[in-house]
Amino acid sequence: MIGIIGAMEIEVNALISMLENKTLTKISGINYYSGKISDKDVVIAKCGVGKVNAAICAQTMILTYSPDVLINTGVAGSLSEKLNICDIAVATDVVQHDMDTTPLGDPAGFITGIDLVKIPCDIRISQLLYNCATSLNEGNCILGTIASGDQFLNSDAQKKKIIDNFGAIAGEMEGASIGHVAYMNNVSFSVLRVMSDNASGESNIDFPKFCELAAEKSIKICKSFIESY
């Protein structure tokens, strides 16, 4: 089974509408829609914005549906000169950019327990997402680190700090927490993001303007991934 998680309705609703033999289960306030797309077993959920919402959703999905793979899909802010609005980022690994125990001597982003800064994605899954994105000719697509934090990135200073600390190519608010949960449960995962803004001082203007278009593109790539998986 393929598990797909998005933070907002706009990031998952079109995929939910594609489900055949659809079943709805509500757990801890989150709706999980399961069924088939292209004869593949799929479960889809809108987790809500932020790392805690995403982690609750991912853990519940794993315990309830036992997916083979988790995909976090949606929009993000670009942290790379190679990614313009509506270009595509696929994660090779993820990092929680707002995790900070540096006063205790840890590196920025260090997660105690798993003792990692960057959580590795399943490279086979990331490569398949990349191949699907490039074959659809939906814009430039690059592989790299995707950073997550409980902040909407809206300043050049925030952007520079994340780039300097982690070399991330895109910033958002859920992927690394989903990756953290997947990693601890030994479930393959990756993150697919389409750029809705440049994570700069104008992102609050660009985001509402380009969010829908970026989300449509991520859904198209997810559908191709499901068909190819």
Residue ranges of each PLM-predicted region?
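Alpha-helix C-terminal capping segments
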Residues: 60-64, 82-83, 180-188
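Mid-sequence, gly/pro-rich, charge-dense loop/helix-turn segments that line enzyme active sites
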Residues: 79-166
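Proline-aspartate-enriched helix->loop->beta-strand connector
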Residues: 66-71
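His/Asp/Glu-rich mid-to-C-terminal helical/loop segments that flank catalytic regions of hydrolases
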Residues: 199-229
